[in-house]
Design a protein with these regions (language model features):
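Short beta-strand-to-loop acidic/aromatic patch adjacent to the donor-nucleotide binding site
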Residues: 1-7
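Non-catalytic, C-terminal membrane-associated alpha-helical segments of glycosyltransferases
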Residues: 135-141, 145, 149-198
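Active-site donor/metal-binding and catalytic loop motifs
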Residues: 109-133, 139-146
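Conserved donor NDP-sugar-binding/catalytic core segment of glycosyltransferases
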Residues: 11-43
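A short, conserved alpha-helix in the catalytic core of glycosyltransferases
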Residues: 76-78, 82-87, 93-119
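Nucleotide-sugar donor-binding loop of glycosyltransferases
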Residues: 3, 32, 117
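A recurrent flexible, glycine/aromatic-enriched loop bordering the glycosyltransferase active site
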Residues: 59-78, 94-95
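Short, hinge-like loop/turn segments at secondary-structure boundaries
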Residues: 44-49, 131-134
Length: 198
């Protein structure tokens, strides 16, 4: 799976994405995403897509909580036989987060997902506050439609991410990010809350 807004960063992007599946290290894989803009998204990408690869399985759910189902189909691969066996997306239509839905099915059914840090793509957005609100409104709708995901803890993922973003923005003297951080987070929070009430 590759979305239309992804830019390939490395020539070995595809081979590095597929080889772990071919070698039976995992059953699904996804690429490292790098933002080429200087917004909050840049630091969120750094946190969510580090430079070290990792594999997640059912055994990691207790430690990771909801983050065990983190997966991005912006640049990803799934074994065909596994995708067919699991009936893919079950014919459902999602407002967003369809990648989390399939990741949940993979992990719960005993399959492994690998994050491939050496498969790099550029994937960037510059959302206005209104667009950010809409994005998280749709995310809230997704969680309302798939309430079983609310059984998994978020742990400290949100607060850790906020600390990371502010720390990195301060290090780089990125004042625009620091000034816009609070309204950006409010747009996300309110959007999510309203979406869950949809």
């Amino acid at each position: 799976f590759v979305t239309q807004d992804v830019i390939i960063k490395r020539k070995d992007w595809l081979s590095n994405l597929l080889q772990p599946i071919i070698d039976n290290e995992c059953d699904a894989s996804y690429s490292r995403q790098i933002s080429n803009n200087n917004t909050i998204e840049k630091y969120i990408r750094e946190s969510n897509y580090p430079n070290i690869s990792s594999i997640v399985s059912k055994a990691d759910i207790n430690a990771l909580g909801l983050k065990a189902f983190f997966f991005s189909d912006a640049s990803s691969a799934i074994k065909r036989e596994v995708f067919v066996k699991l009936n893919g997306y079950d014919g459902k239509k999602f407002p967003t987060n369809e990648d989390m839905y399939i990741a949940y099915k993979l992990i719960i059914n005993g399959y492994r997902i690998k994050y491939c840090a050496d498969s790099e793509v550029i994937h960037s957005h510059k959302f206005t506050f209104k667009q950010q609100y809409k994005r998280y409104y749709d995310t809230g709708r997704f969680f309302k439609q798939n309430k079983f995901l609310n059984n998994y803890k978020v742990n400290k993922a949100g607060s850790n991410l906020a600390k990371y973003v502010l720390k990195r923005a301060w290090q780089e003297k990125n004042w625009s990010v620091i000034v816009n951080f609070l309204p950006n987070m409010i747009a996300r929070y309110v959007g999510m809350k309203m979406g869950k009430k949809f």
